[in-house]
């Protein structure tokens, strides 16, 4: 699947090349462990996640510009096991349908402050591994960064790795994958956080 994505024969994640690499590496700790994506879009990130797990669940309301069927068709064509949960990320029906604890969650749905914070507050209880928040430090969506930083300040979650436009959160200070990344790349280390970003660092880090 990865080769087909690299050849542009399948949708790719809406990420920079560095962020795609970090996304892939951070999932490598959780081979065939339950994973969840909230906000599927065209399915590029979900396909990348399927490289690491056969226990993948996808939440989307499908009321944006992309339909569900092309994504569904890809997973059926390549016989990738996946469970679709249709609905808004914050809806009670969607939350009630979640029966798993996930090792990796990719949040890429809400871009407002309230929506991002609500997703983090609701979905962190379903995760005992890593949460990746997409569009962190993305200038188009500043409220994502603000909401994520406020969530971290008021919870036991830590920012352990910051890429171009995404951040990885964990209750731990490090994961095996984040340690390997630290050894491979020139990074900025501050308060146990690893920064690989050309964006403005979070305000509490600047200070």
Predicted feature descriptions by range:
Residues 8-13, 17-207:
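S-adenosylmethionine/decaboxylated-SAM
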Residues 1-4:
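N-terminal, positively charged/glycine-rich alpha-helical extensions of SAM-dependent methyltransferases
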